[in-house]
A protein has these predicted regions:
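A beta-strand edge to alpha-helix "cap/lid" segment located at domain peripheries
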Residues: 1-27, 35-126
Length: 126
């Protein structure tokens, strides 16, 4: 993976890694202090919990389709807001969701952008 990916490219890689269930591809994209708010339950999970759920196949994504995205950059921080449609399973139960998301990226000392926070909400307009 290039060290010079934009936040938008890291976002694309994040969705691709989720769909592939590829933890080794996902881990370099995530900040060490990464947190995610689950779209279905509203629960907060850290990097270790997300990667474990994917590695153990508790969480699987059949597809994550990006519908739209807009971004703002503020120095060493970038915020992307977008819409996705996704399908997968959690603990064996199938799910589908149309979501709006906010992803916050930070640029580290090594100049690489990493996803620091992800928040998903149901898209009522979908």
């Amino acid at each position: 993976m290039s060290d010079h990916l934009s936040p938008e490219q890291v976002d694309d890689e994040f969705f691709a890694a989720l769909t592939a269930g590829d933890v080794s591809r996902l881990e370099p994209l995530l900040d060490e202090r990464f947190l995610i708010v689950d779209i279905m339950s509203g629960a907060v999970a850290d990097r270790a919990a997300l990667t474990a759920a994917l590695a153990e196949r508790v969480l699987e994504f059949e597809r994550v389709e990006l519908i739209e995205r807009a971004g703002r950059h503020y120095g060493e921080t970038a915020i992307l807001v977008g819409r996705t449609e996704m399908a997968g399973s959690f603990a064996g139960a199938a799910f589908t969701a149309a979501s709006r998301y906010t992803h916050v990226f930070v640029r580290g000392a090594d100049t690489r952008w990493r996803l620091a926070s992800a928040q998903g909400s149901h898209d009522r307009e979908a």
